[in-house]
Amino acid sequence: MIIMQNTKETIEVLNDLIQINNDRITGYEKAIKETKAEDEDLKVLFATMIAESHRNKIALATEVQTMGAEVENGTTTSGKIYRAWMDVKAVFTGHDRHTVLANCEAGEDAAKRAYHTALEHESLPAYIREMLVQQQGNLMASHDEIKSLRDQYA
């Protein structure tokens, strides 16, 4: 019975992370639209972040399917870990580099918190934990890059 409960919890954690990655994709798609034409470098960076989240989603979804469960393809409005990215998307009011980057950083903070919370689940199998730690490391690097760029335009 404990194994089934652990599997259920693992599936829930993975699906929540799929949803936060969906939020991240949606957020960066919005950021691309809100970014001025002359800020092509930011558009390329945001496209890279979108690709990163797609890779994360594929890896997470593969594990969910391997466990015989259905993949949650929504966003965190129906999830449990963090809904912050949706709030971030709603506050895109300015189109200057600093504002766009500041909003992206807030979204990255939400993703960081989601992965931190996910890794607090002690019942995660070691191979899942290893995958999440790797994804978390990539997200940390992305966060730091966004923050560094934001600070340049403060």
Residue ranges and their predicted role:
Residues I2-A154:
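Amphipathic alpha-helical hairpins
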